[in-house]
């Protein structure tokens, strides 16, 4: 079907006839610029006086112009060396906000019996706090290495691997579906960047939120204006 703007800023690329929220058992969110309003790595870089440099790499990665996401993240994290944990806490307290409709959508999903997964190419410093704030069931993201309260410019390997990139997001979605005993077609995946496309491609419903052009085009549904909870206009 041709993309159809069913109301201003809400576009359906693939027909989703009469879907109900209760048809699904899991919703997976990207964090940066999807569930929250910022790219955390860019804001941490601001404390090091390197925001422009880091943000340029982030933008290229999210547009899908960088083929090696892991290497791009390593480059950005290396530029954070010397930033204090206190500066990261300040980013969390003063700059990070949930995007409009985030809390309402998460609560509606929980009320309908869905489990909630947060998968991020960002960092546990932030995903753990968002998890606790919203009562999220599962998370996967990257650990920043610190020494004496300062970032070393490196990340810590975890039991599942080294970096949560697009492929790891896809694997985590599938793993979580396996744990729940459900099909990936019973999952919703929401994101904004190229590294969200692998998990969005596995889900029964893929939703782009204020996304890069390539992601808007490939998602089944695109929310281009308004809050995350606009999904509830389609999936009641």
From Swiss-Prot:
Any GO BP: L-serine biosynthetic process
Cofactor(s) this protein cannot do without: Mg(2+)
Alphabetical UniProt keywords: Amino-acid biosynthesis, Hydrolase, Magnesium, Metal-binding, Serine biosynthesis
A GO MF label: magnesium ion binding
Cited InterPro entries: HAD-like_SerB (IPR050582), HAD-like_sf (IPR036412), HAD_sf (IPR023214), PSP (IPR004469)
Top-level class of the enzyme under EC nomenclature: hydrolase
CDD domains: HAD_PSP
Residues reported to bind substrate: 39, 76, 120-121, 169, 195
Organism domain of life: Bacteria
Catalytic activity: O-phospho-L-serine + H2O = L-serine + phosphate; O-phospho-D-serine + H2O = D-serine + phosphate
GO CC terms: cytoplasm
Biological pathway: Amino-acid biosynthesis; L-serine biosynthesis; L-serine from 3-phospho-D-glycerate: step 3/3
Active site per database record: 30 (nucleophile), 32 (proton donor)
Gene3D superfamilies: HAD superfamily/HAD-like
SUPFAM superfamilies: HAD-like (SSF56784)
E.C. designation(s): 3.1.3.3
Binding site for Mg(2+): 30, 32, 192
NCBIfam families in the record: HAD-SF-IB (TIGR01488), serB (TIGR00338)
Family: Belongs to the HAD-like hydrolase superfamily. SerB family.
Name the record gives this protein: Phosphoserine phosphatase
Lineage of the species this protein comes from: Bacteria, Pseudomonadati, Pseudomonadota, Betaproteobacteria, Burkholderiales
Name of the gene encoding the protein in the UniProt record: serB
């Amino acid at each position: 079907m041709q993309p159809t703007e069913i109301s201003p800023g809400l576009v359906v690329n693939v027909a989703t006839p009469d879907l109900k929220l209760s048809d699904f058992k899991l919703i997976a969110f990207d964090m940066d610029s999807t569930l929250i309003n910022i790219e955390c790595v860019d804001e941490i870089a601001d404390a090091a006086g390197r925001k422009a440099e880091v943000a340029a790499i982030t933008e290229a990665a999210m547009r899908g112009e960088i083929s090696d996401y892991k290497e791009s993240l390593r480059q950005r994290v290396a530029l954070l060396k010397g930033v204090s944990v206190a500066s990261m806490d300040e980013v969390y307290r003063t700059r990070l906000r949930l995007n409009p409709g985030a809390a309402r959508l998460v609560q509606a999903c929980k009320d309908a019996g869905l489990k909630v997964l947060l998968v991020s190419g960002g960092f546990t410093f932030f995903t753990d706090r968002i998890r606790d704030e919203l009562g999220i069931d599962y998370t996967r993201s990257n650990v920043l290495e610190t020494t004496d309260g300062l970032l070393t410019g490196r990340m810590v390997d975890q039991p599942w691997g080294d970096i949560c990139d697009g492929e790891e997001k896809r694997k985590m979605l599938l793993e979580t579906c396996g744990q729940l005993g459900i099909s990936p077609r019973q999952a919703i995946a929401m994101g904004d960047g190229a590294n969200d496309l692998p998990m969005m491609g596995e889900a029964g419903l893929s939703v782009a939120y204020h996304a890069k052009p390539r992601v808007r085009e490939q998602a089944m549904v695109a929310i281009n204006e308004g809050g995350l909870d606009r999904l509830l206009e389609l999936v009641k």
